[in-house]
């Protein structure tokens, strides 16, 4: 039987790049990798209301640069920047190096796969019907510019005795086209009947040429200039 590969891993260095961007040798590699995992876990668990999509970590020289992509940056920054300074101090203690924080606003959370998956998971926890949650997410994504979207939910859907997988798709989602800009994410909904897994694929158009940093750069430019990035 065929198996679906991870769309992000398949497109690394084509139109996607890594979320951890640094180089290390020997035991330093394991130490930095563990630090990255701790940083991401701490940020996501302590800022659940910020709607965080991803955390990008770069380590030039002795500096640790952390970029947080979130739909609600105000929750991270806090009143007069007090909360972000506390976060920076905590991360500096965890890593033992100088930390620079950069907050990037996600202007269209409806077409961000991680936020869509987490939104569906939150609705399932609140006992919203899974078909209604999936259809609502699909319609919102298409309305805001996605060319195609597919959502799958797997588990004891609706409290059924036997677990199954249900999916809903609209538009094009060309997983075999490497130049396709496919945004993919997973989430879990911990319900009274057990864990339900959610997977989301969003097709945002094709990226011609070899530019792994294209999407990240457009989002950073939009943050500083106030102009929304093109699909």
UniProtKB/Swiss-Prot annotation:
GO terms for cellular component: cytosolic small ribosomal subunit. Belongs to the universal ribosomal protein uS3 family. GO terms for biological process: translation. This is Small ribosomal subunit protein uS3. SUPFAM superfamilies: Prokaryotic type KH domain (KH-domain type II), Ribosomal protein S3 C-terminal domain. Keywords: Ribonucleoprotein, Ribosomal protein, RNA-binding, rRNA-binding. It comes from the Bacteria. The keyword Glycosyltransferase does not apply. CDD domains: KH-II_30S_S3. Gene3D superfamilies: 3.30.300.20, Ribosomal protein S3, C-terminal domain. Binds the lower part of the 30S subunit head. Binds mRNA in the 70S ribosome, positioning it for translation. GO terms for molecular function: mRNA binding; rRNA binding; structural constituent of ribosome. SMART domains: KH. Pfam families: KH_2, Ribosomal_S3_C. Part of the 30S ribosomal subunit. Forms a tight complex with proteins S10 and S14. The lineage of its organism: Bacteria, Pseudomonadati, Pseudomonadota, Alphaproteobacteria, Sphingomonadales. InterPro entries: KH_dom (IPR004087), KH_dom-like_a/b (IPR015946), KH_dom_type_2 (IPR004044), KH_sf_prok-type (IPR009019), Ribosomal_S3_C_sf (IPR036419), Ribosomal_uS3_bac-typ (IPR005704), Ribosomal_uS3_C (IPR001351), Ribosomal_uS3_CS (IPR018280). Residues 39-107 form the KH type-2 domain.
